Amino acid sequence: MSTVASKMSEFYVFVYGTLKKGEPNEMVMADGEGGRSKFVGFAETCRPFPLIVSTQFNIPFLLKDPGKGRKITGEVYIVDEDKLNALDELENHPHFYVRDLETVVLSESGETKDVWIYMLPEWREELLLNGSEFLASYNSEGAHNRKYVDRYLRTQQLEKAGHTLIVEVRQPRT
């Protein structure tokens, strides 16, 4: 298993939601946009996780609760440090999502890779109660019938309401 690519400044990243090809934020993974990236292939997590679509903005959330849910299918990329930092900023790591190493199996070769994956470490119970069923794969136009709301639109709505997505989603620390 390998965590980094051939160069020390390159990392494997697994994306499962709106960053996948054909999804609303696919441009983030484009090579040269905030760093270098290269598509490696499709993959599936070795362990199951809860993947849901929830909140009024229909955001896909991978909950850090291994062993529950389903094995998740997604895409693996090799990224440089600049792209990894850009992804950390996008995912608000470590304040909202956390970036952890998980093992995936590449679909084409059957090879296993340790990859970085962004997960929600804690959440309010309402996130599950109001969310979709556990998914194995996310598609913004999927059978869950929950159309994704773009970031700029939800930021405007949250600002008008006077709070943030973190307040809506994350369980307060005790």
What would you call each of these model-derived segments?
Residues 2-174:
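Glycine-aromatic micro-motifs
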